[in-house]
């Protein structure tokens, strides 16, 4: 398996998979639309045509790695690449009256070697034209690009695109598609965070991970005053092709994407990931191992939330493990899942560069029946914040064979809070630390005599107040070890309850401990389910080291 690093900021990771066969499919191509910058010939286009295109492409051999870039682009530094600006006067919808949205393209260069073709579509006539690369579409500033090497390179293509929304037209983008099949969006903070992907292949198998590419996009010309736009995409890789339709609603406080895909397998696929998302978790309230900085927490997302097909809500706090971990949570027709960033308090991060308190959550809502499968969660060890180490996706139960065709529909919510939440009590935070002593009486003369690890889980909302007089009962299940010193504490500042227990080992095993807990009152569940994975230290590390100097 091969993971990749992200260049944070305006860039996603560079594409590393093969080129598309779209050039042969469009050898006679032709497209028309209302954009001033579209310069290709006209040809009809709609989703059914794109589906046929993807289907036919799957019958041909994948064309492999992208062709080399001109030297002046291939050797660019990240700083030089970032200094290239698209000319806002030549934006895609610049000539649309009362436009509320506009689109600009990313330049090829540096690690962005995969040629992406762009087309402008007139939705009234279903006619489109290609937008060919030309240097005059960009301002090169001090990037040091030798534009003479780019003259006549109309087939160079682009690296991706981004969309702006009024009143920040041409200033602050709200949607970005860049690198392989990665894309992102923001909420009203204009702060990017985690990413989504068109598809994930062999993320956790004995094969090398495959990163499909979006190799072409078709943009319906937006209507005057509209804050919704539609873009179509062709996906291609060694194992699969796909036709995608994105209907993207750029609302005041969030971005909502309606996604429809039609997939065509070239080869057998061991692990297919639908609606994949990629995030970062370095340290948080539950995992302090990598928090030796001035920042109390460093993460794009703090939990995986799942609304199962049977109605159960699950909160799974994220980890930065010492060893790569992959967990698969079985479900049947899931109602939704997502990686959430619910802690929005600046004081909990103290970060004026990353602004992690402003980063959006991403929620997936299936729009058709997905059947049986698993929600996969991969957590990769990281020493800092420049590696996206969290991956989550839906994996259908049925194995994918060459020639298979299937379709998925889902909605993505990029927002501060997911559109739905558990009506019962919800997990607010998870904390861990030294155990083995009564709360409030940590001994000052010596460490606790017996080693233990304390867990404190805060629940808020639901019917906790009504349940309290009747008796709140935490139901705790452990895969190994035992829970002792279980306490139920009312926390006035959050108007909620903290369930606290100490975990004691019953063996020398260092295997991960799966923990499960929910709250019950008179036999009925009154909270969502808390899932956690704890990694016990080796037996010789299960002791407290007194490093005080008393003389």
From Swiss-Prot:
Gene3D superfamilies referenced in this protein's UniProt entry, alphabetically: 2.70.98.10, Immunoglobulins
Lineage of the organism: Bacteria, Pseudomonadati, Pseudomonadota, Gammaproteobacteria, Enterobacterales
Modifications after synthesis and translation: Predicted to be exported by the Tat system. The position of the signal peptide cleavage has not been experimentally proven.
Family according to the record: Belongs to the OpgD/OpgG family.
Keywords on record: Periplasm, Signal
Pfam family, one: MdoG
Main location: periplasm
Species per Swiss-Prot/TrEMBL record: Escherichia coli O127:H6 (strain E2348/69 / EPEC)
Gene Ontology cellular component list: outer membrane-bounded periplasmic space
PROSITE patterns with a match to the protein in the record: TAT
GO-annotated biological processes: beta-glucan biosynthetic process
Subcellular location: Periplasm
Protein name: Glucans biosynthesis protein D
Involved pathway(s): Glycan metabolism; osmoregulated periplasmic glucan (OPG) biosynthesis
Signal peptide (from-to): 1-32
GO molecular function annotations of the record: carbohydrate binding; catalytic activity
InterPro entries in the cross-refs: Gal_mutarotase_sf_dom (IPR011013), GH-type_carb-bd (IPR014718), Glucan_biosyn_MdoD (IPR023724), Glucan_biosyn_MdoG/MdoD (IPR014438), Glucan_biosyn_MdoG_C (IPR007444), Ig-like_fold (IPR013783), Ig_E-set (IPR014756), TAT_signal (IPR006311)
Function of the protein: Probably involved in the control of the structural glucose backbone of osmoregulated periplasmic glucans (OPGs).
């Amino acid at each position: 398996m091969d993971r990749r690093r992200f260049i944070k900021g305006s860039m996603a990771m560079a594409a590393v998979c093969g080129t598309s066969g779209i050039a042969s499919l469009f050898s006679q191509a032709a497209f028309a639309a209302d954009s001033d910058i579209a310069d290709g010939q006209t040809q009809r286009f709609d989703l059914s045509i794109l589906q046929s295109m993807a289907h036919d492409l799957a019958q041909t051999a994948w064309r492999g790695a992208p062709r080399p870039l001109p030297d002046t682009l291939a050797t660019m530094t990240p700083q030089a690449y970032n200094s290239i600006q698209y000319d806002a006067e030549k934006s895609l919808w610049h000539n649309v009256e009362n436009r509320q949205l506009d689109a600009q393209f990313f330049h090829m260069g540096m690690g962005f070697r995969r040629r992406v073709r762009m087309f402008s579509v007139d939705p009234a006539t279903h006619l489109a034209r290609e937008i060919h690369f030309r240097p005059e579409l960009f301002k090169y500033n001090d990037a040091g690009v030798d534009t003479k090497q780019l003259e006549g390179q109309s087939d160079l293509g682009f690296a991706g695109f981004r969309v702006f929304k009024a009143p920040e037209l041409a200033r602050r983008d709200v949607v970005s598609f860049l690198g392989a099949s990665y894309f992102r969006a923001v909420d009203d903070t204009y702060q990017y965070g985690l990413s989504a992907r068109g598809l994930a292949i062999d993320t956790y198998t004995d094969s090398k991970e495959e990163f499909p590419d979006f190799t072409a996009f078709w943009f319906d010309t937006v209507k005057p005053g509209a804050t919704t736009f539609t873009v179509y995409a062709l996906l291609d890789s060694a194992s699969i092709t796909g036709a995608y339709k994105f209907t993207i609603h750029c609302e005041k406080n969030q971005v909502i994407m309606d996604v429809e895909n039609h997939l065509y397998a070239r080869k057998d696929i061991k692990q297919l990931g639908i609606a994949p998302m990629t995030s970062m978790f370095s340290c948080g309230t539950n995992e302090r191992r990598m928090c030796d900085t001035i920042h109390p927490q460093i993460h794009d997302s703090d939990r995986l939330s799942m609304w199962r097909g049977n109605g159960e809500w699950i909160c799974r706090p994220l980890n930065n493990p010492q060893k790569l971990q992959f967990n698969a949570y079985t479900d049947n027709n899931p109602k939704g899942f997502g990686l959430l960033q619910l802690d929005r308090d600046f004081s909990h991060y103290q970060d004026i560069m990353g602004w992690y308190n402003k980063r959006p959550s991403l929620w997936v809502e299936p729009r058709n029946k997905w059947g049986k499968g698993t929600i996969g969660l991969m957590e990769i060890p990281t020493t800092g914040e420049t590696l996206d180490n969290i991956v989550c996706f839906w994996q259908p139960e049925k194995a994918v064979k060459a020639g298979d065709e299937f379709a998925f529909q889902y909605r993505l919510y990029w927002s501060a809070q997911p559109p739905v939440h558990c009506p019962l009590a919800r997990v607010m935070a998870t904390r861990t630390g030294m155990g083995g002593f009564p709360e409030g009486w940590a001994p000052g003369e010596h460490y606790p005599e017996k080693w233990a690890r304390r867990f404190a889980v805060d629940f808020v909302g639901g019917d906790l107040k009504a349940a309290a007089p009747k008796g709140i009962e935490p139901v705790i299940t452990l895969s190994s070890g035992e829970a002792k010193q279980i306490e139920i504490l009312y926390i006035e500042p959050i108007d909620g309850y903290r369930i606290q227990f100490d975990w004691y080992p019953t063996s020398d095993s260092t295997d991960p401990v799966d923990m499960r807990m929910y709250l019950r009152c008179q036999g009925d569940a009154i909270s969502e389910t808390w899932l956690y994975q704890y990694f016990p230290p080796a037996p010789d590390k299960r002791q407290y080291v007194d490093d005080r100097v008393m003389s």
